């Protein structure tokens, strides 16, 4: 099985690079984005791309990774901010993915609504069940995505009131959208770095600088 990983930040990517070195993998580039690949002990292959922050970067890198490597699934991993019902240091898994900053309200649409049949996405059911069955402490929640770092109580309350979102990030819904269009099984797994409030910037930096390998360890543990 070939597992594709889409990762936004250098610090989030570094633990995967270290695993690549440990397993004797290779480093290269896909459409200008840094990528690494390695085989696990059980013969599964992990291919990871460093997409950069934000929805456009994530969407472009996801499409490039799928076209170049033809993985069996795509996993988006990294850090997120806690919105509701989840807390800093929790590991969360997306049960729905949507964009909180898409705004056509002058044209009569509600915030977040797109004039297309599908704009809220779900994870692949088999992948979701595999992760939640093996790791009982994972918390399922709604992932809301936008091209902004959420760091205010006002914005946080807006997201809660509008969607009841569990956590916020800057990539997952974009990756989900590309995977939906390309008929690629998708899942996002995140560790919560901050509370998406006025203290978020500082606590995010602290968490990011740790370069923790908990998420890639879970993936290797599951796929062997």
Say what each PLM segment does.
Residues 80-163:
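Mid-sequence, gly/pro-rich, charge-dense loop/helix-turn segments that line enzyme active sites
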Residues 149-201:
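A C-terminal functional module that forms or caps the active site or interfaces directly
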Residues 1-63:
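N-terminal short beta-loop-beta anion/metal-coordinating cradle
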Residues 70-75:
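Proline-aspartate-enriched helix->loop->beta-strand connector
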Residues 196-224:
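His/Asp/Glu-rich mid-to-C-terminal helical/loop segments that flank catalytic regions of hydrolases
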Residues 46-52, 142-144, 189:
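Active-site-proximal beta-strand elements of phosphoester/diester hydrolases
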Residues 64-68, 84-86, 177-185:
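Alpha-helix C-terminal capping segments
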